[in-house]
Amino acid sequence: MENTIIKERLSEELKNSGLTTIEIAKRIGVSPEMITQYRTTKKLPKLDTFAKLCMELDLDANYILGLTKN
């Protein structure tokens, strides 16, 4: 599992969610600035934040982590 793949896939999924940065931030309890950093592949979320993102946005954690191709 490579950080680059995780960052790229998470960024892609956040952009495709149809939600604004502020909406995502409110849903998972982080600042909009943190979501911006995830969207721009500058930073990875902590594990608990990653879990919240996956649950709130119905994301496939296995895909984001590079364990599956789609």
Task: For every predicted segment, state its role.
Residues 2, 16, 42-45, 56:
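Helix-turn-helix/winged-helix DNA-binding modules
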Residues 12, 37, 55, 65-70:
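Short, charged recognition helix plus adjacent turn
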Residues 48-63:
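DNA major-groove recognition helix of helix-turn-helix/homeodomain DNA-binding modules
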Residues 21, 32, 47-50:
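Helix-turn-helix DNA-binding elements, focusing on the entry/boundary residues of the two helices
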Residues 24-25:
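Short alpha-helical "recognition helix" segments of helix-turn-helix
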Residues 29-44:
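Recognition helix of helix-turn-helix/homeodomain-like DNA-binding domains
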Residues 1-19:
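A short, Lys/Arg-rich alpha-helix, primarily the initiator
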